Regions:
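Conserved active-site neighborhood of the chymotrypsin/trypsin-like protease fold
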Residues: 45-127, 142-145, 155
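Bacterial N-terminal signal peptides
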Residues: 1-6
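Gly/Ser-enriched beta-turn/beta-hairpin loop segments
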Residues: 17-18, 32, 79-85, 133-146
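Residue-level recognition of beta-strand microenvironments
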Residues: 44, 78-81, 136, 164, ...
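A conserved glycine-rich beta-strand in the N-terminal activation segment of trypsin-fold
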Residues: 11-12, 28-47, 53, 71-74, ...
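C-terminal cap/linker of serine protease catalytic domains
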Residues: 11-17, 60, 97-99, 168-204
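Terminal peptide-recognition signature
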Residues: 24-26, 41, 48, 52, ...
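Catalytic nucleophile loop of clan PA
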Residues: 152-172
Length: 204
């Protein structure tokens, strides 16, 4: 049974085009201004609050994001992070009045629900990866940690996972062990959004 409607265009939900504009590429630099890491993230507010994986930012002196239309914007401050679940919330110095942002899902998808992963792309394509929620475990209060029937490629870590109605519920995370061909994981986007530390800017 193939659950991978990989890069299928036919069934792309109508919200995909707009939602993909919220996904960006992240580049972090070390103190010698050499590239440290590259990855993905996405906006969750129109004024530039975004989510990604904390691993990307470890040891970084500065970071920039590259939007789907090629605009480069600086990361201004880390707003919160969780090392164990590898999430980070940060503010981007946006270049316009506002950016396209994803709406956080109010209701967590249940086991068996169809879900979509939106990759970062500079092309105007409607590519996505379809999968299903295998299970959802509760973590730290009312948040969820998801196991998904979905194959994850390396460059998809921290891409947004969407419900069928186009709301973001999770950040894609690396799978490890034998199940990597069929299974991946996701941390609750609302958990990432709840992270708060006293504002640290990269200049500090």
């Amino acid at each position: 049974l193939c659950l991978l409607a990989q890069w299928s265009v036919a069934q792309a939900p109508k919200w995909v085009d707009k939602a993909k504009r919220a996904v960006f590429s992240v580049v972090t630099y070390d103190q010698d201004n050499k590239i440290l890491n590259t990855g993905n993230g996405f906006f969750v507010t129109e004024d530039g609050v975004a989510l990604s994986d904390y691993t990307l930012f470890k040891g970084a002196q500065r970071a920039v994001v590259m939007s789907s239309d090629g605009a480069q914007m600086p990361v201004e401050a880390i707003m919160g992070a969780d090392d164990m679940y590898d999430v980070v919330k940060f503010r981007v110095g946006i270049s316009g009045k506002k950016v396209t942002a994803l709406t956080l899902a109010a209701v967590a998808p249940a086991a068996g629900a169809d879900v979509y992963l939106l990759p970062y792309s500079t092309q105007k394509d409607r590519s996505f990866t379809a999968g299903k929620v295998k299970e959802a475990d509760k973590i730290s209060g009312n948040y969820s940690y998801y196991t998904l029937d979905m194959r994850l490629k390396d460059k998809m870590v921290s891409c947004p996972l969407m419900t069928v109605d186009g709301q973001v519920f999770g950040l894609a995370q690396k799978s490890s062990g034998q199940d990597t061909a069929t299974i991946c994981y996701a941390i609750d986007a609302n958990f990432a959004m709840s992270q708060n530390i006293s504002a640290l800017s990269y200049g500090d």
